[in-house]
A protein has these predicted regions:
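Hot-dog-fold acyl-thioester-processing enzymes
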Residues: 337-400, 456-476
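Hydrophobic beta-strand-centered segment that forms part of the acyl-chain substrate-binding groove
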Residues: 380-430, 444-446
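Rossmann-like NAD(P)-binding element
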Residues: 45-48, 63-122, 129-130
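NAD(P)-dependent Rossmann-like dehydrogenase/reductase catalytic/cofactor-binding core
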Residues: 2-7, 11, 36, 216-339
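NAD(P)+-binding Rossmann beta1-loop-alpha1 motif at the extreme N-terminus of oxidoreductases
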Residues: 2-63, 115
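Active-site-proximal catalytic alpha-helix in oxidoreductases
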Residues: 28, 153-162, 178, 187-213, ...
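Rossmann-fold dinucleotide-binding core
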Residues: 121-195
């Protein structure tokens, strides 16, 4: 995970990223690299490439920091280059995200390899081509791998890696540092893993519309109100394992396996994409979502993704588990100061307001002020020794009184810092005073918190254990 100076390096050199092709996926890569603290060079021949990338960046800056409980590294530097040669010169990772035409990609690789370092990773975002196809006629074939992400790249963590074992392992390490989930595909196959599954659902959806069984809205509703929610946190096979009951997966297959012989799907057939069918789909889609601009839909999507992934963090499950790991690394890189003297405030928390915390008034809901202050207390207590290990021994602190004063609005994307002072430490009693400030140093809220040390077995208050008592005594 990169620090404020972006930690992953080759030797002592900070990694540099290049992006060739700045469309939806390429722009997403640019945002992911920049917001994780790395410098990026971009080449794109489209006259509006700069505008489109900046629009993607605007969405990413608004949503990506809200995934985490700590601030992200200082944003890297973005440079638009007039040629491939200039963009890839000195790059450690080159992301190719140009149109899905094999001949164009191979021509691009020839120019890239003529100017990039020989040990650089050339990672194609292709959703369908195999590495062996991309590598044909390349001067250094193994240098080219597939790193297939999902839109929006700055939020969704999955990247499918296909190619040389040594290169993909190295790529996986870099992607993990970027907060992504690299999935190394065991053998190359057209469309890799995820897109083969998506293609099956897409084909069936086209038939349902073609045959007049369902509209675009009804198909989307079947996904987002049903199995889509299950898939988002358990995938397909884990979901079916539950369906098998106590007898497990084998029972599920025995029970539902015969259904595979029934005419439930048309997976090997595709309806002819006639003008009539295309117009039908487009018209239904316009009725469903035409009231929103694409930019509005992107922001709705991003807000929902942030909210869902943050919910998964609570149970440390799926994508939430990955985000919690990233938070631990970010926390280690921004270790808070701890008080030396009674009443002296120290910074206990730095974070960004996620869009999912904003209510109907357009600002952070009051319930989340308490959440931020609670996190600040946890950080301070952990620094004094009352951490998870201490809790596992059967001791902790309970809040028995808390007062918050709301002094200024906090909006989505605002960077907040909490400064905490211990104002009383007598036996089992602990009092804290918090101040929440925004990036301009304005005090947004204050909080007075009274805690009691508790024995978790008896559920009654008691004096702190010797290590904690000694740490508190040093503050007197």
């Amino acid at each position: 995970m990169p620090s404020n100076a972006a930690s992953h390096s080759s030797g002592n050199k900070k990694l540099h990223f290049a992006v060739i092709g700045g469309g939806v996926i390429g722009g997403g890569w640019v945002a992911r690299f920049l917001l994780m603290g790395y410098d990026v060079s971009v080449f794109d021949t489209a006259p509006d490439a700069r505008r489109k990338i900046n629009e993607v960046l605007e969405n990413a800056r608004r949503s990506m920091p809200g995934l985490y409980e700590h601030v992200l590294p200082k944003e890297g530097r973005l440079v638009f280059c007039p040629s491939i040669a200039e963009a890839v010169r000195g790059a450690d990772w080159i992301s190719e995200s140009i149109p899905e035409r094999l001949d164009i990609k191979q021509l691009a690789y020839a120019e890239i390899q003529a100017h990039c370092p020989e040990n650089a990773i050339i990672a194609s975002s292709t959703s369908g081509f195999k590495p062996s196809e991309l590598q044909k006629n390349a001067s250094t074939p193994k240098q080219i791998i597939v790193a297939h992400p999902f839109n929006p790249v700055y939020l969704l963590p999955l990247v499918e890696l296909v190619g040389d074992a040594q290169k993909t392992e190295h790529a996986a390490n870099i992607l993990s540092d970027l907060g992504m989930y690299p999935l190394i595909v065991r053998k190359e196959i057209d469309a890799h893993i995820a897109d083969r599954l998506l293609e099956a659902v897409w084909r069936e959806g086209l038939w349902l519309i073609n045959d007049g069984v369902a509209t675009t809205r009804e198909i989307d509703d079947a996904i987002r109100y049903g199995f889509g929610l299950r898939w988002a946190q358990m995938g397909m096979f884990e979901t079916y394992r539950i369906a098998g009951g106590e007898a497990g997966m084998a029972h599920f297959i025995q029970q539902f396996g015969p259904a595979l012989e029934w005419p439930w799907t048309k997976l090997m057939d595709v309806p002819a994409l006639t003008d009539e069918l295309v117009d039908k789909i487009a018209s239904q889609s316009d009725q469903q979502s035409g009231q929103y601009s694409i930019r509005a839909l992107e922001r709705i999507r991003d807000d929902n993704l942030v909210g869902m992934m943050r919910a998964l963090k609570v149970k440390d499950w799926g994508a939430g588990n990955l985000l919690n790991q990233i938070d631990q690394t970010l926390s280690a890189e921004t270790d808070p100061e701890y008080p030396i003297n009674m009443g002296v405030p120290c910074c206990t928390t730095r974070r960004v307001v996620p869009s999912s915390w904003v209510d109907y008034n357009g600002h952070m809901n009051d319930s989340h002020y308490g959440e931020v202050f609670s996190k600040a207390s946890d950080v301070l207590l952990a620094g004094m020794g009352a951490d998870q290990d201490y809790v596992s021994q059967g001791y902790s602190y309970f809040t028995v009184d808390l007062h918050i004063s709301y002094l200024a609005e906090c909006l989505a994307g605002d960077e907040l810092a909490v400064f905490t002072a211990i104002t009383l430490a007598e036996g089992k009693k602990l009092k804290l005073a918090h101040e929440m400030k925004n990036a301009e140093g304005e005090i947004c809220a204050t909080c007075s918190q009274f805690l009691l040390h508790v024995d978790l077995n008896t559920r009654k208050s008691c004096p702190p254990r010797p290590p904690i008592a000694a740490a508190l005594a040093r503050l007197q």
